[in-house]
Swiss-Prot record:
Residues recorded with modification N6-lipoyllysine: 65
GO biological process, one term: glycine decarboxylation via glycine cleavage system
Cofactor(s) the protein needs: (R)-lipoate
Keyword terms, alphabetized: Lipoyl
Gene label: gcvH
Lineage: Bacteria, Pseudomonadati, Pseudomonadota, Gammaproteobacteria, Enterobacterales
Descriptive protein name: Glycine cleavage system H protein
Domain Lipoyl-binding: 24-106
Length: 129
């Protein structure tokens, strides 16, 4: 079974969300998602300053197997992207929950964050896939 850190929130599309000290949220794809995709070769990052709605495709992860959209788990403004992925997309594979993060977002509505899955619910989702 994939690693599902307890402190994160999760989307049904296999993105994770972590609240930062400055009130923003860091977003990436889960260990389960990167395992399905395989070795990353490119990550198309969103533009900083872009406003997105929950469920919008805002980035693309390209692997040796497929290209997969990455969706905004909550509505808000993209405030940072992980530029290290331009040269090292494999960070998404080796460290999906830390160095392999994809973007940071300032959430427009905290209720959307609360509506995401907790680790227990996400683990249950994985068991049913």
């Amino acid at each position: 079974m994939s690693n599902v850190p307890a402190e994160l929130k999760y989307s049904k599309e296999h993105e994770w969300l972590r609240k930062e000290a400055d009130g923003t949220y860091t977003v990436g794809i889960t260990e389960h998602a990167q395992e399905l995709l395989g070795d990353m070769v490119f990550v198309d990052l969103p533009d900083v300053g872009t406003t997105v709605s929950a469920g919008d495709d805002c980035a693309v992860a390209e692997s040796v197997k497929a290209a997969s959209d990455i969706y905004a788990p909550v509505s808000g403004e993209i405030v940072a992207v992980n530029d290290a992925l331009s040269d090292s997309p494999e960070l998404v594979n080796s460290d999906p929950y830390t160095d392999g993060w994809i973007f940071k977002i300032r959430a427009a509505d905290e209720a959307e964050v609360e509506a995401l899955l907790d680790a227990t619910a996400y683990a249950a989702l994985l068991e049913n896939e």
